[in-house]
Amino acid sequence: MNTPKLIIILAVLSIGLSASLAAETNTDSATPSCCSTSLPAGEFTDKSLYQVESTWTTDQGKHIKLGELAGKPQVVAMFFANCQYVCPVTVHDMQRIEAALAPELRARVGFTLVSFDSKNDSPAALAEFRLTRALPKERWTLLHGESDDVLELAALLGVKYKEDANGQFAHSTVITVLNAQGEIVRQQIGLGQDIKETVQTLEKLVGK
């Protein structure tokens, strides 16, 4: 982890995981405001997730840092490809958000899925998932990471997860909107939620 703050976050996540999964509720949670002052390329605020130095692999086999997603808003969720119920609904919710944007705005928003399953969700497995779900390459990014990096990112996103003995994951369902600098500006918690406010947030971010 890169800072004492991250270490504290991860400790809290570990202690509270089981209770938090049991108590999760399906409500929307929004963080204030969205539009930050533009920064020079490669520089991020202290609230930006793009400060994380970990390296990820896309389903196309490209190695990237999260900062390479900067420049336009991102709709981000964590999942695993073998998930039979929750994750497909989460992806569908993201597709609902995508479809609700006007075509000219849709092209200015990215959609990112990050796998919990470092062991099984190889780039090839993620590429197959993309084909199965018909996720356009020009807008959607699918990421595989090492287990420690996944844990760090999950903590920063407020996503709680735990692998069971069968290789399945119990996890919270959170769709996060990041602004162009990688700051969290909205989180939609739970499945099948009303997407209106999330769409409005994205419209503001891209300057409708």
Feature names for model-found ranges:
Residues 1-57, 205-208:
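N-terminal targeting signals for export/organelle localization
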Residues 51-52, 74, 172-174:
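Short loop/turn microsegments at loop-to-beta-strand junctions
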Residues 66-94:
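Short active-site neighborhood of thiol/selenol oxidoreductases, capturing the structured segment around
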Residues 69-71, 80-81, 114-119, 135, ...:
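Solvent-exposed coil/turn segments that connect beta secondary-structure elements
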Residues 73, 98-105, 133, 154-157, ...:
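Sec/Tat-exported extracytoplasmic proteins
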Residues 91-153:
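Structural microenvironment flanking redox-active thiols in thiol-disulfide oxidoreductases
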Residues 139-140, 151, 157-163, 170-175:
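Structural micro-motif
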Residues 164-208:
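Thiol-/selenol-based redox modules, centered on thioredoxin-like
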